[in-house]
Swiss-Prot record:
It catalyses: Exonucleolytic cleavage in either 5'- to 3'- or 3'- to 5'-direction to yield nucleoside 5'-phosphates. Heterooligomer composed of large and small subunits. It comes from the Bacteria. Its EC number is 3.1.11.6. One of its GO terms (cellular component) is exodeoxyribonuclease VII complex. Signal peptide: none annotated. Belongs to the XseA family. It comes from Streptococcus agalactiae serotype V (strain ATCC BAA-611 / 2603 V/R). It is an enzyme of class 3 (hydrolase). One of its GO terms (biological process) is DNA catabolic process. This is Exodeoxyribonuclease 7 large subunit. CDD domains: ExoVII_LU_OBF (cd04489). The lineage of its organism: Bacteria, Bacillati, Bacillota, Bacilli, Lactobacillales.
Length: 446
């Protein structure tokens, strides 16, 4: 009669077979991820094909080393060992490594991180900084021994010899390269005299360029206060650093050209052009001033200067005539008084009359002398005052005191009446004549 085994005995036997079977120690398996829900530590999911399903477990240490995100329905190639779980009698695969089936893990990681950063706005144009037209100092984050720095120095020196280049040496591939690149970019941003940064390296495989796809490098470029030009790999290579940079260059030479958009030759040409324009402008200004000078020489003020004081001469003649008439009237009054005295003296004794007459004559002479002196002094004072006023109105004296004589069509102007916007006026000053155009007319009481 056969012995019956217990369930646990059978399960232990099967587990022993599983553990000692060399074919189950390292299994290479292809399947589709199912029932995946990310957990804080260890990950539990299923792998299936169109006929079967196997449970899969991935410990947290192995899961953190994945270069991509596991997703529901993703077809993957995994490496692991098969074990049997005694309490349930079920078997599963303990996954140690995994990569997407058909494309590499780096490729899927690239697309996943690109999508994440794009959704976060890292690549938006609104965050892009403009490359300055004129730079004095360029920072370069790259390997000190590569061809990148040599190409940049050669190109910048050719295009604009005065620009200084400051190298910030860093690893560009291998373990720890991404962190060192990010730290070096942050260090360069502490330099206050830098105008922009070039970040890059030469060509290589996707593994060689991978440091420039790391999130820490993308964040360092995004946070840079300096404009950043990326130059990673060859023209056909594209990294996440290229997407986040303010400008992307296919080669180090192209990066140097982007960093110096204006060359020394451009500036010299610009200066020459400005010199020619200034020269032509000066010639036109000189010709205009010469034409105005000729017009001023033909002005009535220069051809007939006496017209400026004709009116004052007439006024002086009138004052002289008034003075003469006043003196004549005073003499006539004195004669009349003498006649009246003569009539009064006729009825008086001759001697007494003569005596009285003599006294009257003396008084009259005194009065006449006093009156004549007073009138003369008064008229002389008025004459001198008028003469001073006339002298003060001399055009040369007027303009010497800071005033100007204004004419419109050779006619003196003393009021805003009849003056309109756009009229051309001639303004005589102490040292020359101005041709002016009226821009505005405002009437004000002064």
């Amino acid at each position: 009669m056969s012995d019956y085994l217990s369930v646990s005995t059978l399960t232990k036997y099967l587990k022993l077979k599983f553990d000692k079977d060399p074919y189950l120690e390292r299994v290479y398996l292809t399947g589709q991820v199912s029932n995946f829900r990310r957990r804080p530590n260890h990950q539990y999911f299923s792998l299936k094909d169109d006929k079967s399903v196997i449970q899969a477990t991935m410990w947290s240490g192995h899961f953190k080393k994945l270069g991509f995100e596991l997703e529901e329905g993703m077809k993957v190639n995994v490496v692991g060992r098969v074990q049997l779980y005694e309490p349930s009698g079920s078997y599963s695969i303990i996954v140690e490594k995994a990569e997407p089936d058909g494309i590499g893990a780096l490729a899927i990681q690239f697309e996943q991180l690109k999508k994440k950063l794009s959704q976060a706005g890292y690549f938006d144009d609104r965050h892009k900084q403009l490359i300055p037209q004129f730079v004095r100092k360029i920072g370069v984050v790259t390997s000190p021994s590569g061809a990148v720095i040599r190409d940049i120095i050669t190109t910048v020196s050719r295009r604009f010899p005065g620009v200084e280049i400051l190298l910030f040496p860093t690893k560009v591939q291998g373990e720890g390269a991404a962190q060192e690149i990010a730290q070096t970019i942050a260090l360069a941003n502490e330099k206050k005299d830098l105008d922009l940064l070039i970040v890059g390296r030469g060509g290589g495989s996707i593994e060689d360029l991978w440091a420039f796809n790391e999130e820490c490098v993308v964040e360092a470029i995004f946070e840079s206060r300096l404009p950043v030009i990326s130059s990673v790999g060859h023209e056909t290579d594209t990294t996440l650093a290229d997407f986040v940079a303010d400008r992307r260059a296919a080669t180090p030479t192209a990066a140097a050209e982007l960093a110096t958009p204006v060359t020394k030759i451009d500036i010299l040409s610009w200066i020459t052009e400005r010199e020619n324009r200034m020269y032509q402008s000066s010639l036109r200004l000189i010709r205009t001033k010469e034409e105005r000078l000729q017009k001023s020489k033909q002005s009535v003020i220069f051809r007939q200067p006496e017209r400026l004081y004709d009116g004052f001469l007439q006024k002086l003649d009138n004052l002289n005539q008034q003075l003469t008439y006043s003196m004549r009237d005073k003499l006539q009054t004195v004669r009349q008084k003498q006649g009246l005295l003569h009539q009064k003296l006729q009825g008086i004794d001759l001697k007494q009359r003569i005596h009285i007459y003599q006294e009257r004559v003396v008084q009259s002479r005194r009065l006449l002398s006093s009156t004549m002196t007073s009138q003369y002094d008064s008229k002389l004072a008025r004459f001198e005052k008028a003469q001073d006023a006339l002298i003060s109105l001399d055009s040369s004296r007027i303009v010497a005191r800071g005033y100007a004589i204004i004419e419109k069509n050779h006619t003196l102007v003393s009021t805003t009446n009849g003056i309109n916007e756009g009229d051309h006026l001639q303004v005589k000053m102490q040292d020359g004549l101005l041709e002016v155009e009226v821009k505005d007319v405002r009437q004000e009481n002064i």
